[in-house]
Amino acid sequence: MESRVLLRTFCLIFGLGAVWGLGVDPSLQIDVLTELELGESTTGVRQVPGLHNGTKAFLFQDTPRSVKASTATAEQFFQKLRNKHEFTILVTLKQTHLNSGVILSIHHLDHRYLELESSGHRNEVRLHYRSGSHRPHTEVFPYILADDKWHKLSLAISASHLILHIDCNKIYERVVEKPSTDLPLGTTFWLGQRNNAHGYFKGIMQDVQLLVMPQGFIAQCPDLNRTCPTCNDFHGLVQKIMELQDILAKTSAKLSRAEQRMNRLDQCYCERTCTMKGTTYREFESWIDGCKNCTCLNGTIQCETLICPNPDCPLNSALAYVDGKCCKECKSICQFQGRTYFEGERNTVYSSSGVCVLYECKDQTMKLVESSGCPALDCPESHQITLSHSCCKVCKGYDFCSERHNCMENSVCRNLNDRAVCSCRDGFRALREDNAYCEDIDECAEGRHYCRENTMCVNTPGSFMCICKTGYIRIDDYSCTEHDECITNQHNCDENALCFNTVGGHNCVCKPGYTGNGTTCKAFCKDGCRNGGACIAANVCACPQGFTGPSCETDIDECSDGFVQCDSRANCINLPGWYHCECRDGYHDNGMFSPSGESCEDIDECGTGRHSCANDTICFNLDGGYDCRCPHGKNCTGDCIHDGKVKHNGQIWVLENDRCSVCSCQNGFVMCRRMVCDCENPTVDLFCCPECDPRLSSQCLHQNGETLYNSGDTWVQNCQQCRCLQGEVDCWPLPCPDVECEFSILPENECCPRCVTDPCQADTIRNDITKTCLDEMNVVRFTGSSWIKHGTECTLCQCKNGHICCSVDPQCLQEL
């Protein structure tokens, strides 16, 4: 309970504070009449008394005028309105009887982004707008506004939610496709007209405002109920969640692309480091490794054999190898018994009695080494070996390598009878005579390999390998043969492309009648495919149901061509690319909306009171009608009941709300028809008989500005039925059959939607946000959200009422 109170308090203080008790925030308000600076200098408009004296009111007269906001003023309006989904149109007006005119219009070229219109011809208020899918929409609200009386009108738009108030009474509340306020540059703002030639409003307007805020109707009618949160608040929350999901998907896609680019970085130049034996070296840095002089170049270690110097050594020294170094260095020597010994070398001397004495070269003198005793040997004396550098014998097969050796990498230590020596591994050669340092033999560079044609020799440490060139497959370790990807179907050509094998690869070329890069080919139709047709082969269009012809340019009249057999209780009505069976007079649909009209059932006029039989007759229901029967023996008057009033037999009258329809009572039956127009009669009603109006001022100009129509002429323009009536053009949406289905599509160049079973084909879906999708990364997606499929760059997926629909953009593929 407390949470609901807090939420309500929050909504009242923060959501409605700008309206209730605190006035309207000027940054959220567009006062149209004030900003347009209307005055005596404005042609066709003059100031008059209004409904109240608080603000100015203006009379829009029946004269040529151009009430249009300047470019700067219009842009100020649009900065407040652009990309907003919560706003209200407010106006106080008094419209001339029977006038059909535009209250305000925001449009760019022929695209009406927001237009409010009142038709006195058809007694309805219309809202024209464009949705986020860039389709035009018209919402019609039946209401008599053009009655020469004062009215307060407010139209609140909250995302996909519309509320129409008139005189502070909620008249209509609807859920529609969300209007788009993504207004492009060059959009114009008109008041009281659509443009210089059409939609002239006639009457008085006062307090014309646009409030960019929730439930702006409160400013006009403070006592109206408020709701919190609004539809736009809810849409905003869902949108934020979808945006976060989109950010996550885009981030994942960017990461995937970054990984791919990192794999291609070796094609780019950048400073690269080298690592050898745990040490990292920078670009161009050099160092000595054993008998090699190495340098880091572009991330690769390049080594050359070290050239050793040959220095002159001082007296009592000579050149000798030093542990851990490749080149010889000067080292102290000793002369003993006619031989030369280097510092640290030992030698044994045996006395005549067989006693062993050990000497070591130290400080240029052979010095006696004290004996520390020898370990006992476990081999017979015949297997014992005398050593030249030790008084202790060893057994045959002794492991000298385990004691100490100077063999470096790529060199192995080998045991001889009395010492250890170094030997280069297979595939390596010695860098000095003792084999302590060895280098790899590059069999590829020296031609010491066995790789045959169609292969490339790659050197490896101590060996080499033969790899196949691109487009070839391996036969054995040393040879490869040609690989025909076209024959083995190991190519990436489109099914509508031809594969041509080349040396080491293949080429893809689209077949005649198809366009693309070979890996993606699309059929090409020279004249295009109209009315939603699809080009499926060279100059072959697959036409949607209801159209025919090479380019699907011809509408099939299913009604006259006999393709459709409507039920006897229905009439066949042809539509562009479609048809429907409409219940005949005296019948109505039972709610099943069957395509052939089987759901049309008889209206029981007698039971529902929809008959005109007088009280002295008895109503008998008939199939598709009724009969007024006089009881036997009774003298009936033949009078009729119409709109609750008695009409005498033979009486003729004009309908109250339609002065152009004449009704008569004939023996209990009311028959109504349009007034017969006699253009020779000088008193003919030109409103009902506009075709009898000869005045040039009553002509109308077509929306394209090229065709002139006489009063009474009708035409179809952008899925709207238009009529010229005494110089005024009035247009209303073409009637479409009810579409009671979850998924529908509005084919190109058609005016009425059709039902489809596949949600991926649908462009209009009754979005149910409770239905979610689970994408390929197990991320929950809301209905309406879209994302780039993981691991791809050109596959766009969308969640449609729990169904995942994906499509590939061929142009995107070509740009990769």
From Swiss-Prot:
It is found in: Secreted. Its main location: secreted. Glycans are attached at residues 53, 225, 293, 298, 517, 548, 615, 635. Residues 272-331, 638-693, 698-756 form the VWFC domain. Residues 64-228 form the Laminin G-like domain. Pfam families: EGF_3, EGF_CA, Laminin_G_2, VWC. Residues 1-21 form the signal peptide. GO terms for cellular component: cytoplasm; extracellular region; extracellular space. Gene3D superfamilies: 2.60.120.200, 6.20.200.20, Complement Module, domain 1, Laminin. Disulfide bonds join 401-413, 407-422, 424-438, 444-457, 451-466, 468-480, 486-499, 493-508, 510-521, 525-535, 529-541, 543-552, 559-572, 566-581, 583-600, 606-619, 613-628, 630-636. Plays multiple roles in neural tissues, regulates neuronal proliferation, survival, differentiation, polarization, as well as axon guidance and synaptic functions. Plays an important role in axon development during neuronal differentiation through the MAPK intracellular signaling pathway. Via binding to its receptor ROBO3, plays a role in axon guidance, functions as a repulsive guidance cue for commissural axons, helping to steer them across the spinal cord midline. Required for neuron survival through the modulation of MAPK signaling pathways too. Testicular luminal protein that signals through a ROS1-pathway to regulate the epididymal initial segment (IS) maturation, sperm maturation and male fertility. PANTHER family: NEL HOMOLOG (PTHR24042), PROTEIN KINASE C-BINDING PROTEIN NELL2 (PTHR24042:SF0). Homotrimer. Binds to PRKCB. Interacts with NICOL1; this interaction triggers epididymal differentiation. This is Protein kinase C-binding protein NELL2. It comes from Pongo abelii (Sumatran orangutan).
